[in-house]
Amino acid sequence: MGVSVVIPTYNRAALVSRAVDSALRAISPGDEIIVVDDASTDDTERALAAYGDRIRYQRVPHRGAGAARNFGISVARNPLVAFLDSDDEWMPHILTLERALLQARPDVLFCCSNFAVRAKGMEKRRYLSNWFSRPCTWDELFGPGVGYSSLAPLPKDVPDFSVHIGDFYLSLVKEGCVCTITVLVRRESAAEALRFAEDLPTYEDWECFARVARVGLGAYLDCETAWNYGHSGPRLTDAEDYDRATTRLTIYSRVWGHDRDFLSKHSALFEEAVRTQRLIRARAMLRDGRRAEARDELRLVKDAPLAYRAASLVPGWLFSGNAIRSVLKAKDRILERASGVRTRIGAGG
């Protein structure tokens, strides 16, 4: 089965060659690399010209990483599609492992894996669990694992590892557990579900793969297949916390909130996920002095913490000594509950 590799890029002239080179090392005859240039204003086109017909260069109007990926999917010629961001890098064995798994298990719609991070001169291995809001096992998230070698041949230089096949649609409510640059998916079987949101400021990949997971089974390969070059910076501001929680609520509503069958079985899980994001929004409002708005938000939260309710009612209470620290600690406790989606390090495209 051939693979179409989609690489969106925007003003990454100094970095895109690293991504393309890693994709060239990973592909096989019949595969293709589609680089979608989201109207870069730097020397990206010149940097890619050297590859000639080894890649398909496509320049599109500037509409963001989600739209660029969607364009790449629309012009893909092969039955399998993989994604790589232009500032990241694949490990050489990614397509060998994932393609063989999908060939061995035609009932699996897509697969993904762990990854490693390079940031500020440091390396962090097996990074995916850092996205989780609480400690949990791969068995808990994806179902019992089996050895990869029991499903497909292992490359000589790769030690055996576990593969977990299961319902990612349920798992993605609990945790952000799919890293886009490690995904290989059956294009035609995923159909319209394989589409990235173009109206969201972030988490468009989370929504996309939640929709894909609703269509069919996913497989998690417990090995590293990619390097993410992290853009670590200062702690998120309250405004950013608010915006991200708002986006998460939008996705919860659009994906799971309209799925009656899912809600009939997992309403408590869904409600807890929504509750967590509403508390994050309320906390940001309180820190910003928007007490009336925070009260409105807290009315939508079952059993809202006393510290939040007090801060929304008493003028100035939030900004007095230990009170603000108690609210900050409350946020940490909230995020430990099983529902949030951990912010991904690194930017798409």
Regions found by a protein language model. Give the residues of each.
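Acidic helix N-cap motif at the loop->helix transition within catalytic regions
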Residues: S17, D42-A50, E89, H93
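Short, acidic, metal-binding catalytic loop of nucleotide-sugar glycosyltransferases
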Residues: D21-G30
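A conserved acidic beta->alpha catalytic loop
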Residues: S22, D37-R46, H62, D85
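Glycine-rich, basic loop-to-helix element that forms the pyrophosphate-binding segment
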Residues: V60-A76
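Short aromatic/hydrophobic "clamp" motif used to bind/position activated sugar donors
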Residues: V81
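Conserved donor NDP-sugar-binding/catalytic core segment of glycosyltransferases
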Residues: H93-G147
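Conserved nucleotide-sugar donor-binding catalytic segment
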Residues: S113, W138-Y242
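Catalytic core of nucleotide-sugar-dependent glycosyltransferases
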Residues: E224-S232, T237-K265, L286-D303
